[in-house]
């Protein structure tokens, strides 16, 4: 026999039907499988996208997938109200924009890796200078700020232990472990992720942070960590092939002289560009890589933007820069 109403007049068995209804709604909302032909027909007939070459379009969907290509890059080409493509937009333009983002990831990753390499070199040098070359030293929680960040330090040390654990697919780690029974930090850093490197810097003693930050004299050790944190997030996006052009993070780089020089607007005291978007990464690179390297980075970035705008005539420069978090005068960053 079913129970009567519970307190408040609800039936005890009502949650069962509630869960069942939720599942039903989820199933109804789930997208159905579509063949490549159906996908192209949907784009053309339902969404108004021009497809000049159906064979090329099908092969592209086979190679990239509908979700990665259309799901990831359609928004810039749609009418905000109708959610249909702007008249004249072609499939080829979306493909061109996809490849633009692909090239963007390669460009940013190239220079982020330079920052990562330099940072790892500075950390391993100054940490080893203080504590010595034994792996037990960087695996010892008390050599970090364990008092204030015990959980985070333990997590870091555990991850470092796994990085140098045997058997290792890193030949250089396996070599040192077998021959010397020790993997010094300057070897281990080569296998460390940017996330591990960022955490290592954050939780190592302040005196070592200060020494490392002297390689970047314009900023304090805390401000350097802000740069590193945002760069690490961007690196992950690049390395995992995620969408980069509209990159955003909850972390922020510090206010810089460049924000002021470029006349970036403020709202409630916060700069509206270059704090936690892709332009923030550009600013970080301006301070963290050599001047000549940054000039080359800026040149190649400018060429990528000009090239994609030529290939995507229905995409305006203002629209693209806004999505990227770039001010209109972003190229004056060197002046």
Positions of PLM-derived features:
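Extended intrinsically disordered or low-complexity regions, especially N/C-terminal cytosolic tails and loops
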Residues: 1-233, 245-335
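Acidic/aromatic/glycine-rich contiguous surface patches that form carbohydrate-binding/processing clefts
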Residues: 241
């Amino acid at each position: 026999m079913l129970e009567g109403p519970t307190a408040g007049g609800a039936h005890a068995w009502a949650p069962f039907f509630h869960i069942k209804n939720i599942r039903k709604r989820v199933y109804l909302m789930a997208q159905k499988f579509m063949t490549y032909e159906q996908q192209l027909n949907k784009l053309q007939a339902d969404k108004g996208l021009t497809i000049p070459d159906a064979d090329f379009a099908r092969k592209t969907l086979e190679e990239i997938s509908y979700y990665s290509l259309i799901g990831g890059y359609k928004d810039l080409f749609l009418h905000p109200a109708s959610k249909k493509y702007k008249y004249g937009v072609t499939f080829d333009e979306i493909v061109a924009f996809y490849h633009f983002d692909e090239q963007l990831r390669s460009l940013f990753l190239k220079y982020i890796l330079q920052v990562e390499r330099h940072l790892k070199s500075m950390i391993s040098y100054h940490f080893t200078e203080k504590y010595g070359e034994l792996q037990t030293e960087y695996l010892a929680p008390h050599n970090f700020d364990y008092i204030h960040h015990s959980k985070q330090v333990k997590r870091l040390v555990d991850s470092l232990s796994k990085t140098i654990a045997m058997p290792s697919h890193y030949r250089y780690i396996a070599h040192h472990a077998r021959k010397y029974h020790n993997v010094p930090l300057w070897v281990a850093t080569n296998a460390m992720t940017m996330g591990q490197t960022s955490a290592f810097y954050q939780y190592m003693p302040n005196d070592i942070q200060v020494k490392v930050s002297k390689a970047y004299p314009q900023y304090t050790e805390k401000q350097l960590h802000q740069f590193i944190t945002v760069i690490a997030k961007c690196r992950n996006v690049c390395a995992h092939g995620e969408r980069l052009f509209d990159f955003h993070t909850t972390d922020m780089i510090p206010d810089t002289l460049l924000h002021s020089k470029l006349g970036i607007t403020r709202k409630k005291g916060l700069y509206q560009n270059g704090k936690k978007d892709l332009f923030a990464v550009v600013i970080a690179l301006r301070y963290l890589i050599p001047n000549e390297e940054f000039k080359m980075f800026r040149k190649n970035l400018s060429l990528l933007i000009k090239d994609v705008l030529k290939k995507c005539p229905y995409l305006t420069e203002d629209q693209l820069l806004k999505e990227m978090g770039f001010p209109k005068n972003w190229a004056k960053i060197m002046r």
